[in-house]
Curated annotation (Swiss-Prot):
Role played: NAD-dependent dehydrogenase that has high activity with L-rhamnose and L-lyxose, and shows only low activity with L-mannose. Has no activity with NADP. Catalyzes the first step in an alternative pathway for rhamnose utilization that does not involve phosphorylated intermediates.
pH effect on activity, per entry: Optimum pH is 9.5.
GO molecular-function terms, A-Z: L-rhamnose 1-dehydrogenase activity; NADH dehydrogenase activity; quinone binding
Protein name: L-rhamnose-1-dehydrogenase
Active site: 147 (proton donor), 161 (proton donor), 165 (lowers pka of active site tyr)
EC code: 1.1.1.173
Recorded catalytic activity of this chain's protein: L-rhamnofuranose + NAD(+) = L-rhamnono-1,4-lactone + NADH + H(+)
Family stated for the protein in its record: Belongs to the short-chain dehydrogenases/reductases (SDR) family.
Binding of NADP(+), residues: 19, 68, 95, 161, 165, 194, 196
Pfam families, alphabetized: adh_short_C2
Induction cue: Up-regulated by growth on rhamnose.
Length: 258
């Protein structure tokens, strides 16, 4: 198979559901060898098996790795196993994240710490591990952080979540400065309202869905596949001079003030 990512090895955290899954599928279709991290559970293992069956090209182009991304050692393990399997890593997509809607006055320390550890701390250590390997290889690379429109605006029921996504955006900007001298590009994608498990309950409510769609100039909520295209662009050589950028993928939601 040939494509925009032919010959590249890509690792994705949180890659068996939602946005991560869509990115994994489309990157494989564009010729990449794909390493997919997922939570160590029976359900996620089954999803990983199904994903592998869907995108495998018969040439052993997919590796799935269970692991809790909130643990610093998980990022290192993903990179180590990716290199052991495919010899190198060229693209790293930090996607794993959680978002349970909560009233600010009722958020417990446990909920906050879990959200920060998964969404931000885990991303930091995984990105660091990927960058260390890319520097060792001496061939540059591309690191993509999946942030959110929530990095730019507030959310009454997301006070534990929005700071982590703002943190991802800031992390990608700072790593762009820190790693540019090694030829490693770091960029953020900021999805708007995307139909995933994170907002499944909200989108089941006809009134809430109508309200959400009414605020989006394109008139629909996004599909996970809508994020895959921008991710492929940032992973590919077409974006060789794109570094420290934030790519808002929201159907026009952010700019619609009326």
């Amino acid at each position: 198979m040939t494509g925009l990512l032919n010959g590249k090895v890509v690792a994705i955290t949180g890659g068996v559901t939602g946005i991560g899954r869509a990115i994994a599928i489309e990157m494989a279709r564009n010729g990449a060898k794909v390493v997919v991290n997922h939570l160590p559970s029976e359900e996620q293992a089954q999803l990983a098996k199904e994903l592998k069956e869907e995108i495998s090209d018969g040439e052993n182009n997919v590796l799935t790795i269970p692991g809790d991304i909130s643990l610093p050692e998980t990022g290192r393990r993903i990179v180590e196993l990716a290199v052991e399997k495919f010899g190198e890593i060229n693209v790293f997509v930090s996607n794993a994240g959680v978002c349970g809607f909560r009233e600010f006055l009722e958020i417990t320390p446990e909920t906050l710490f879990q959200t920060v550890n998964i969404n931000l701390n885990g991303a930091f250590f995984a990105i660091q591990a990927a960058a260390q390997q890319m520097v060792k290889q001496g061939k540059g690379g591309s690191i993509i952080g999946i942030s959110s429109i929530s990095a730019l605006v507030g959310g009454a029921h997301q006070t534990h979540y929005t700071p982590t996504k703002a943190g991802i955006l800031s992390l990608m900007q700072s790593t762009a400065c820190a790693l540019g001298k090694y030829g490693i590009r770091c960029n953020a994608i900021l999805p708007g309202t995307i139909s995933t498990a994170l907002n499944e309950e909200d989108l089941k409510d006809p009134e809430k869905r109508k309200y959400m769609e009414g605020r989006i100039p394109l008139g629909r909520v996004g599909d996970p596949k809508d994020i895959a295209g921008p991710a492929i662009f940032l992973a590919s050589d077409m974006s060789n001079y794109v570094n420290g950028a934030q790519l808002l993928v929201d159907g026009g939601l952010f700019v619609n003030l009326q």
